[in-house]
């Protein structure tokens, strides 16, 4: 059976970047600093993890908090917050690691006979393990069915409070019932009785929280329209990503022809072409528009690089119908196929729709157990399947697996046999034993109160850190008179001036994002909150193209790093795919350069227009109008794509190292 790929992610711990993953045997969660190739700094045994907490999807920060059981009796449990820092896949990486940890912890608790089972819990709750499992599963992506059982739902207080926040009428009923309950009835018993009659509401709400919108046929939802003889097309970057995922052929055509064609021209021609009708599953007629760019791809394959979770899993040979057909040599129905199996005129349309349906369904999470994750017993039956088929109520109680303790030296357990202390340690112990804590604190407080009146002038805190506030030195206020560069101290003039300049630069940058300036004759007007219409003073169409270009570039970067991290560097298939993706990254940078050139061209046109307005105003009034700088242009585009360009250069540099054999 093919092993499950162990997830890993970029996560910071205590403001230090690193890599978090599980050991190959899935027994420990490890974190090691970047680049993640050294020994792990943090190693947490999965069996010692008592709780998993994750920030909700509405929070931009993705933090996974892992709680470990106390290492000593009476000690507090240790918590390890890991913040995932990947630019686009932080939430997916955190969900993957949390889902796998939740699955392993649930299996460990299900197989441990010393832990209470949810079915045997008391009437007031499902036990600590059930509450932990449910609390860790409320925000997970895929929940096992058993976490929707009655005991689990009644024990999950967080889910109940969330439901009452949504349903005000239910919250009002709960509060009134709680106020009118008898004093002899405990809060736990009241909660159990109250929610026992509303299990269906809890189950429906839990399922609603864990549902998400699936993929859909995006091409059928985009309809170009004509207004006043001009073609109108509304498409956003999310739709572009879906088109690239469902139709790799379109992504290949896009990568080969943009920036030769502009973004708007490419998509306008595509949605009017015959290829678009074919991919949507519509019949092509002789009256349809012909486009030499897209018509040559009508017979091209549209199934390249389609990821599939279902087809990637290994199927048991006993039910592998496709494999049996392969071995048996196909159909045995004579020379002529059945009438229903003969090709018809609409067969290409059916194949197109079936292919698209397979692509959409291929990445839908299955409701049953992943076959590749199941372990098999000696007779070939999956262990998980055999557990489901076994009649648990006919089995006897499992024998508790106790751990035998072997104690060799008991002398250290008694105070009379403690090892002897050194002379210095014994003297310190006697000194500390004779002191009274209240007297010591009083003496320290008295020394602090008399600092300014003891004749020594007190303590100059500025001088202790090397700062002279009376100095006229604007550079470094250090008391060190030696030549050479001096470090900036907290509170010095140089440090305050640096902080002031940094704040002013941030305000200036933020103001440039939120304001745009227009000139009417000799006057100019500053309009605030114009970032939605003209972000960074860029024209609306340029800003829209920049958004689409950024989204497609991020998609190419994501695919490059996914292929780079998930395969062997020496495999020929990976070398070929990495070469194709690296070429796509180079083309992406060319698209950004073309966009910057066009933005600069538009900026020059606006500047020429304003110069003409100023000259006309001078000719009419005889007064000179104030020149207002024009924003946008090449610098604005490069500033917006600064982080993206850095990622492109880093990825291309890594590919060059792979190509030269240094990685």
Curated annotation (Swiss-Prot):
Biased composition range(s): Basic and acidic residues: 453-465
Entry-linked CDD domains: PH_TFIIH
Bias (Low complexity): 515-528
Broad class of the protein's primary localization: nucleus
GO biological process, one term: DNA repair
Domain of life: Eukaryota
Gene Ontology CC entries for this record: transcription factor TFIIH core complex; transcription factor TFIIH holo complex
Domain BSD: 147-206, 227-278
Pfam families in UniProt: BSD, PH_TFIIH
Region (Disordered): 452-491, 513-535
Localization of this protein: Nucleus
Keywords noted in UniProt: Nucleus, Repeat, Transcription, Transcription regulation
Oligomer and partners: Component of the 7-subunit TFIIH core complex composed of XPB/rad25, XPD/dnr-10, tcf-30/SSL1, tcf-29/TFB1, tcf-11/TFB2, tcf-14/TFB4 and rtf-1/TFB5, which is active in NER. The core complex associates with the 3-subunit CTD-kinase module TFIIK composed of div-66/cyclin H, prk-3/KIN28 and rtf-2/TFB3 to form the 10-subunit holoenzyme (holo-TFIIH) active in transcription.
Function: Component of the general transcription and DNA repair factor IIH (TFIIH) core complex, which is involved in general and transcription-coupled nucleotide excision repair (NER) of damaged DNA and, when complexed to TFIIK, in RNA transcription by RNA polymerase II. In NER, TFIIH acts by opening DNA around the lesion to allow the excision of the damaged oligonucleotide and its replacement by a new DNA fragment. In transcription, TFIIH has an essential role in transcription initiation.
PANTHER family: TRANSCRIPTION INITIATION FACTOR IIH-RELATED (PTHR12856)
Protein family: Belongs to the TFB1 family.
Full protein name: General transcription and DNA repair factor IIH subunit tcf-29
Protein source organism: Neurospora crassa (strain ATCC 24698 / 74-OR23-1A / CBS 708.71 / DSM 1257 / FGSC 987)
Gene: tcf-29
